[in-house]
Swiss-Prot record:
Pfam families: CinA (PF02464), CinA_KH (PF18146), MoCF_biosynth (PF00994). InterPro entries: CinA, CinA-like_C, CinA_C, CinA_KH, Competence-induced_CinA, MoaB/Mog-like_dom_sf, MoaB/Mog_dom. This is Putative competence-damage inducible protein. Belongs to the CinA family.
Length: 414
C-alpha cells in the first residue's frame, strides 16, 4: 500500500510551526509495513487543496491529512475532500453530542460554527477526538482510502493510535522494522566508505546513512511478516557493521551519549567533576541530563578567568603565563586540579577560543583543548572546530564526552 501525507495549514508554509505530525505518521506507518511515498504541505486555500487531493489520489492508495478541521471558514480540509469525492456531508449526531460534552467539560460555551466539525458523509467511519473538538474520519472510495486527522499533535497522535491504526491493521501484510546505530568520531563519508558494500548490496534489510549534530546514524530496515522475523534479518547486518566500526558505534535507537556515559559511571561507581572555560557549563549540563547522575557527579565549575583557574582548581600561574589559557598544559592542569579539589575519580576540562573574536594566527578561532584525568592518568586532546560560537561550544562537549567514553572502555570500564 502506497501512502501520502497531506499537511494542511498556511502556518506550516509560513514556517510558524514545524510539521512534526508527518514525521510521526511516517514512522508509525513504517511500523505497519505501509510505505510513505510522498509528503505534501498545502495552505488554507480551496483551489490548491483540491489540486493537492487530485495529485495525492493519483499516486497513493492511502491519503492521510492533518489539520484544517477547525470551526472557522478557512478550515477547509473536510469540505474540499467531500466535494472532491462527490460526498454530501450531514450532521452526525453522536459527534455533535461529543463536541457539546467537551465544551461542558471545560466550562465554555459552544458556538454554532462548531457544528460544522460534526458534519460527515453517511458512509464515513468516524474517528472520535478524545482530546479536542474536531473528530476525524475514514472514507473508502474507488479502492482508495482517505483518513482525515486533526492538526494539534496531541489530538492527532491519540486519534491515529486509537482509531486509524486498528483500521489499517487489516491491510497489513508485512511489517517494516528498523534499528538505528549511532556513530561518533567518524565522518559520514568515511562511514559510507567503510560499509560501502553493505550499503550497495543489502536489499532486505536496507542500510541508509544520515548525518546530524556531529554524529552519523545508520538505519537498518527489514521487511518481514513479524517484528521478530525482521529482527533476525537485521541481526547479522548489524553485527557486521559493529565489527567494522568498532568503538565508533556508541549506541543504538534513541539512546544519547550522556545516557551511555552516565550509565558507565554509575554502574562502576566512578565519580566525575568538570572544569569548563569556553563551554561555560554546557559539558556539565549534558552530563546532568541523565537521571541518577547525581550519585557520581560531584561538581561542575566554570573557571572562565585565569584567576578562577588558579584559585579554584590550582592551575599554576607559570603555566598560564608561559603557555596561555588555551593550551594543552592548561587543559591538563584544569582536569587534574578539578579531580583533586573535588575528590573525584575523573576530572574533565575544556579551554578554547569559541569566537567570533579572540583568535590569532597561532591560536585561531575553533582551537580547543580538552583535558581528561582518570585516577591520576592525565591526557589532553587538541581540537580544530569550525562554525559559529555556539556550534564550536556544542561540538566541544560532544567530542569531550565521546573521548572520555573511549578512554574508559580502553581501561576496561564498560
Amino acid at each position: 500500500m502506497k501512502a501520502e501525507i497531506l499537511a494542511v495549514g498556511t502556518e506550516l508554509l509560513l514556517g510558524n510551526i514545524v510539521n512534526t505530525n508527518a514525521q510521526y505518521i511516517s514512522k508509525r506507518l513504517a511500523d505497519l509495513g505501509i510505505e510513505v511515498y510522498n509528503q505534501s504541505v498545502v495552505g488554507d486555500n480551496a483551489e490548491r487543496l483540491r489540486e493537492a487531493y487530485e495529485l495525492a489520489f493519483k499516486r497513493a492508495d492511502l491519503v492521510i491529512t492533518t489539520g484544517g478541521l477547525g470551526p472557522t471558514k478557512d478550515d477547509l480540509t473536510k469540505e474540499v475532500a467531500f466535494e472532491y469525492l462527490g460526498k454530501e456531508a450531514k450532521l452526525h449526531e453522536e459527534s455533535l453530542r461529543r463536541i457539546e460534552d467537551y465544551f461542558k467539560k471545560i466550562d465554555r460555551p459552544m458556538v454554532d460554527s462548531n457544528k460544522k466539525q460534526a458534519c460527515f458523509p453517511e458512509d464515513a467511519i468516524i474517528m472520535p477526538n478524545n482530546n479536542g473538538t474536531a473528530p476525524g474520519c475514514i472514507i473508502e472510495e474507488n479502492k482508495k482510502i482517505l483518513a482525515v486527522l486533526p492538526g494539534p499533535p496531541r489530538e492527532m497522535k491519540a486519534m491515529f493510535e486509537e482509531s486509524l491504526v486498528p483500521y489499517l491493521r487489516k491491510f497489513q501484510e508485512n511489517v517494516l522494522h528498523s534499528k538505528t546505530l549511532r556513530i561518533l568520531g567518524v565522518g559520514e563519508s568515511r562511514v559510507a566508505e567503510i560499509v560501502d558494500d553493505i550499503l550497495e548490496n543489502s536489499t532486505n534489510p536496507t542500510v541508509a546513512p544520515y548525518a546530524k549534530d556531529s554524529e552519523v546514524t545508520l538505519r537498518i530496515t527489514a521487511k518481514a511478516k513479524t517484528i521478530e522475523d525482521a529482527e533476525k534479518l537485521i541481526e547479522p547486518v548489524e553485527q557486521e557493521i559493529r565489527d567494522r566500526l568498532g568503538l565508533s558505534v556508541y549506541a543504538d535507537g534513541e539512546v544519547t551519549l550522556e545516557e551511555v556515559l552516565g550509565k558507565m559511571l554509575i554502574d562502576n561507581n566512578i565519580t566525575i567533576a568538570t572544569a569548563e572555560s569556553c563551554t561555560g557549563g554546557l559539558l556539565a549540563g549534558r552530563l546532568v541530563n541523565y537521571p541518577g547522575i547525581s550519585s557520581v557527579f560531584k561538581e561542575g565549575m566554570i573557571t572562565y578567568s585565569n584567576e578562577a583557574k588558579m584559585k579554584r582548581i590550582k592551575v599554576k600561574k607559570d603555566t598560564l603565563q608561559k603557555y596561555g589559557a588555551v593550551s594543552s598544559q592548561t587543559a591538563a592542569e584544569m582536569a587534574e586540579g578539578v579531580a583533586k579539589v573535588t575528590g573525584s575519580d575523573i576530572g574533565i576540562s575544556t579551554t578554547g577560543i569559541a569566537g567570533p573574536d579572540g583568535g590569532t594566527k597561532e591560536k585561531p578561532v575553533g582551537l580547543v583543548y580538552v583535558g581528561i584525568c582518570i585516577k591520576g592518568d592525565v591526557k589532553t586532546k587538541e581540537l580544530h572546530l569550525v562554525g559559529d560560537r555556539q556550534r564550536v561550544r556544542q561540538h566541544t562537549v560532544i567530542r569531550a564526552l565521546e573521548w572520555l567514553r573511549r578512554e574508559l572502555i580502553r581501561k576496561g570500564i564498560k
